[in-house]
Amino acid sequence: MLRRIHDKKPLIHHLTNTVTINDCANMTLALGGSPVMAEDLLEVEEMVGLADAVVINTGTINPDMRKAQLLAGKTANRLGKPVILDPVGAGATTLRTDFMKQLMEEITFTVIKGNASEIKTLLGQAARTKGVDVAEGESLDLQSVHAFASQTKQVIVVTGPVDFVTDGVRQHHLDVGTKRLGQVTGTGCMTASLIATFLGAGYGRFDAAVFGTYAMGKAGETAGNRPGIGSFRTGLFDAVSLMTEESLPEVQMNGQ
C-alpha cells in the first residue's frame, strides 16, 4: 500500500474516452485514489474545484467533450490544480491535430503523456499513426522533447519500449514493462490516471510522472506470466493495488 496516497485518497477528475473509462476508474482506485468522470458543462468547473488533479484524454472526442475539456483545463489552471494531457490519436485526423493545437495554446499542462507519434504531433513534427496507436517503426528525437519540455515548463512522458520522462532539466529512462501491455486497450490511458493520482497526493510533477509510468510498467511485468489477455488485464489492477512505498526509491535512484 502507498500510504501517502491512501491517506489522502485524492479525487481525480477524468474527462476521458468511452473505451477505457471504466479501466481508468478502477486503476485510480487500485492505487488508492478516488475517480470521478463528470462531463456535463454545467458541473465541470465545480468538479474541477473539488478535484485534486484533472485528466484530459482525447480518445473519443465530440463537440461537447471538447468544450468540457477546454473548460476543465482552463479552470484547473486558474485554480492551480494539476492537469494531465493524454493526447490519444493526435495526428490521426485534421480534427484531432487542430484540437491538440488549441489545447496546447489555451491550457498549461502539468504533465503530457503520449506515444512517439502523439508527442511528435504536439512538437509540430510529421508523424505516422495507425488509428490511435503508434505506427510501427516511428521514432522520435528525445533531445527535441527535452527542449520542448524546457521551453513550455511542462513534464513530457514518451511511452514506448523504454519510457522517457523529462521536465526540461532532468530526464529519466524507464526500462520496465512488457510487450503484452500493447495487447490490452487502455494501458496508456491508465498510466495517465496513475500519474494524476500521484500528483493529486502531492508528489512533485517530475516524480509523479516517473512513478506513474513506472507503476504501469512494473504491473505489466508482475502480471506478465498470466496465461491469457483477460487474466493479464486483471493482474494489472492486482499488481498496482499491492504496490508499496518500498518500490518508489528504486525509481528515484535510477540514473537520470
UniProtKB/Swiss-Prot annotation:
Keyword annotations from UniProtKB, A to Z: ATP-binding, Kinase, Magnesium, Metal-binding, Nucleotide-binding, Thiamine biosynthesis, Transferase
Domain of life of the native organism: Bacteria
Catalytic activity: 5-(2-hydroxyethyl)-4-methylthiazole + ATP = 4-methyl-5-(2-phosphooxyethyl)-thiazole + ADP + H(+)
Residue numbers binding ATP: K113, T159
Signal peptide boundaries: none
Family membership: Belongs to the Thz kinase family.
Cofactor(s) the protein needs: Mg(2+)
Binding residue positions for substrate: M37, G186
EC nos: 2.7.1.50
Job description of the protein: Catalyzes the phosphorylation of the hydroxyl group of 4-methyl-5-beta-hydroxyethylthiazole (THZ).
Record-linked Pfam families: HK
Descriptive protein name: Hydroxyethylthiazole kinase
